[in-house]
């Protein structure tokens, strides 16, 4: 009996005979897609755990990245396994009802992932354009509202076919595909891709323009600072400080903070720019093929081309963790920490003691330091001074150093401060926080000349009273 006779004899049957399964092809395809899915699940879980387990990554920007990872994880764990089985068997075996649910969840996760990139691009624009005001503009409450709105819009776009906005379902239940009804195809393509893409491109064009302008301004500022002095002095005085000294302090500190903050925002924008570039390359073919095939059936591409563009879009959800790992040193260290089964909530205690420094509520402008290891208080006296200095050979903000020019008084004894390796300096009046490496001096020493002061290497800088790292 030939295949044509099988088709002829079954032309009036309610079910078409299942094609014979190619075992070798199924095994190879299953292994490839299985690795693909496993990589997406593990990679996005690592991204989420990196932020959860590392406090210095718990910022608004990384919360948006976590939301992106959640959307990609849902896609990798709830949609891709059934898509892979569909590809391996070359037919749908889970029934019509589950087919409709699977297609809706597919659109939901993909739309949420794309809109997360849109929100991230807006966040990066604000971070680069207004680096010093960013913590006040992009608060955690506003970030939560943005994430909630993102998911609400994704649900609205994805549930249309569940309420009948689709073409009639085929009689054969082994056929399952996303809706190609022209109206919904255009609506979903515009809402899920083209509108977010327009916002993303507009934001990153603005980021590029602002970054170029800001870089030129900071270079000019660096030249002026260098010709005037290689030091930016931050002094903590009593309440009778003159207005002129305070204004000069604020002006010079503003430049240092602006330089450090902008450098970090620019790096984050570059990393997420790579993410957006990969997103466009992965999703653009599918969102070109889908509406064209729906509106002009004569130009509909073959099933093979459609499947390739479909899985290329899926591939985007699996490569984002790779991008973070390759282009973001903080994520790289966090991944290494997680793979070493070591969840860091704070700075490692093996060779660093973390100190938090806050302004005393009862001692005027003095700063109180408390050691996390033993809680022993240390205090910088009101006459102490701290200086930010850039080495002449430095080319970026990572070469800025901090000098402490005043005595550090320790409660239990001088050895407590001597063992401290990591410190956080806080001054609410200027809204700055520095986490640095400190080479301590004994409390009895007189303030040394500026050139002989101990060096402190900056690890983090924060512009908020709560010490949110930037």
UniProtKB/Swiss-Prot annotation:
Residues carrying lipid (S-palmitoyl cysteine): 343
Extracellular-side segments = 1-27, 89-99, 168-181, 296-303
Region named Disordered: 375-416
| Residues carrying a glycan | 9, 12
Please give the InterPro entries that the UniProt record associates with this protein.
ADR_fam, GPCR_Rhodpsn, GPCR_Rhodpsn_7TM
Outline which residue ranges sit on the Cytoplasmic face. Answer: 52-64, 123-143, 206-271, 328-470
- Kindly give the membrane topology term recorded for this protein: Multi-pass membrane protein
Q: Where in the cell is it found?
A: Cell membrane
Picking any one GO molecular function of the record gives: alpha1-adrenergic receptor activity
The superkingdom listed in its UniProt entry is Eukaryota
Coiled-coil segments, which residues? Answer: none
Q: Name one GO biological process term.
A: adenylate cyclase-activating adrenergic receptor signaling pathway
Q: Which SMART domains match?
A: 7TM_GPCR_Srsx
Q: Which residues cross the membrane?
A: 28-51, 65-88, 100-122, 144-167, 182-205, 272-295, 304-327
Keywords attached to this Swiss-Prot or TrEMBL record, sorted alphabetically, are: Cell membrane, Disulfide bond, G-protein coupled receptor, Glycoprotein, Lipoprotein, Membrane, Palmitate, Phosphoprotein, Receptor, Transducer, Transmembrane, Transmembrane helix
Question: Can you list the GO cellular component terms from the UniProt entry?
Answer: plasma membrane
Q: Which PANTHER family match?
A: ADRENERGIC RECEPTOR-RELATED G-PROTEIN COUPLED RECEPTOR, ALPHA-1A ADRENERGIC RECEPTOR
Biological role stated in the UniProt entry = This alpha-adrenergic receptor mediates its action by association with G proteins that activate a phosphatidylinositol-calcium second messenger system.
What protein family does this chain belong to?
Belongs to the G-protein coupled receptor 1 family. Adrenergic receptor subfamily. ADRA1A sub-subfamily.
The protein here is known as: Alpha-1A adrenergic receptor
- What is the species of this protein? Oryzias latipes
Quick one: which gene encodes this?
adra1a
């Amino acid at each position: 009996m030939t295949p044509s006779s099988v088709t002829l004899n079954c032309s009036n049957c309610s079910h078409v005979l299942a094609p014979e399964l190619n075992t070798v092809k199924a095994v190879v395809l299953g292994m490839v897609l299985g690795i693909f899915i496993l990589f997406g699940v593990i990679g996005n879980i690592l991204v989420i755990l990196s932020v959860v387990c590392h406090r210095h990554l718990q910022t608004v920007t990384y919360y948006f990245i976590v939301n992106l990872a959640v959307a990609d994880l849902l896609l990798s764990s709830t949609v891709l396994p059934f898509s892979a089985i569909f590809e391996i068997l070359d037919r749908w075996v889970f029934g019509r009802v589950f087919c409709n649910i699977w297609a809706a969840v597919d659109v939901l996760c993909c739309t949420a992932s794309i809109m997360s990139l849109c929100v991230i691009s807006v966040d990066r624009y604000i971070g680069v354009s207004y680096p010093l005001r960013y913590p006040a503009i992009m608060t955690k409450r506003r970030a939560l509202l943005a994430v909630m709105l993102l998911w609400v819009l994704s649900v609205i776009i994805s549930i249309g076919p569940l309420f009948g906005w689709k073409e009639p379902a085929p009689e054969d239940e082994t056929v399952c595909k996303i809706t190609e009804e022209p109206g919904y195809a255009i609506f979903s393509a515009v809402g899920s891709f083209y509108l977010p893409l327009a916002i993303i491109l507009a934001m990153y064009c603005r980021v590029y323009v602002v970054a170029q302008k800001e870089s030129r301004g900071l270079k000019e500022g660096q030249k002026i600072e260098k010709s005037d002095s290689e030091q930016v002095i931050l002094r903590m005085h009593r309440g009778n400080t003159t207005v002129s000294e305070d204004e000069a302090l604020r002006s010079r500190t503003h430049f240092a903070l602006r330089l450090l903050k902008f450098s970090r925002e620019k790096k984050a924008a570059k990393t997420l720019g790579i993410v957006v570039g990969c997103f466009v390359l992965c999703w653009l073919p599918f969102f070109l093929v889908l509406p064209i095939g729906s509106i002009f059936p004569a130009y509909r591409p073959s099933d093979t081309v459609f499947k390739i563009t479909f899985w290329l879009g899926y591939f985007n959800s699996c490569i984002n963790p790779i991008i973070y790992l390759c282009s973001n040193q903080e994520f790289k260290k966090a991944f290494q920490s997680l793979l070493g089964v070591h969840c860091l909530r704070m700075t490692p205690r093996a060779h660093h003691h973390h100190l938090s420094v806050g302004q005393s509520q009862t001692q005027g402008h003095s700063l109180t330091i408390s050691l996390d290891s033993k809680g022993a208080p240390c205090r910088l006296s009101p006459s102490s001074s701290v200086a930010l200095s850039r080495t002449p050979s430095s080319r970026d903000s990572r070469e800025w150093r901090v000098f402490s020019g005043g005595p550090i008084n320790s409660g239990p004894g001088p050895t407590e401060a001597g063992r401290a390796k990591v410190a956080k300096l806080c001054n609410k009046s200027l809204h700055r926080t520095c986490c640095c490496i400190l080479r301590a001096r004994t409390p009895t020493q007189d303030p040394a000349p500026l050139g002989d002061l101990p060096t402190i290497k900056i690890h983090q800088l924060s512009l908020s009273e709560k010490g949110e790292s930037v």
